[in-house]
Amino acid sequence: PELTGDVSTDAWAKLLWHEQFTTPARPDAQPTPGTSFAMAHDGDSLFFAVKCKALAGEAPEELARENVQIQLDSERRGLRSGIFVCYTDGKASSAIELEADGKEAWLGEVGYGSRLQAGGWSMVLKVPLSQLAHVEEGLQRIQFNVSRVLRAHGAPNSLLSYPAPKNIHFWRPSNATGEAEFE
């Protein structure tokens, strides 16, 4: 897949898109429509694509201030995870979050592209599989979390996650609870 941020191409249309984004720390919360993601790999890199539609009442300038945070725990132990913060302006940052509080630098380069347009934005993140530490022979499974940060942090309903963690500290490695298996 290309890193243009355009997720309407054939490569993305064939994938399974997940849409059950809900508010963290609210087990009774209903999914909020308008956010979905897909994941793929090509043997060399892992790709995440996210589509974010403007929510009811969301102004264009609010949409432009959003970001998506993707957390990957390739060791599946909840001790450390890569976190990738992806912005609408095409910029991204990456780090390693530690469960024992603290951060380390992400040692590698990632690819990123975004596309902001009226009514929504989309993004594609590319992480080389060689940069993901793992505990077994070959990288076969990862745990992950995808979060959409909507408005100023701390505002009501400012965060949607898939899967929704049990607490609001979504960047904690122990909250990477979704699991993907490579075929």
Predicted regions and their residues:
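Structural preference for beta-rich elements and adjacent junctions enriched in aromatics
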Residues: 1-183
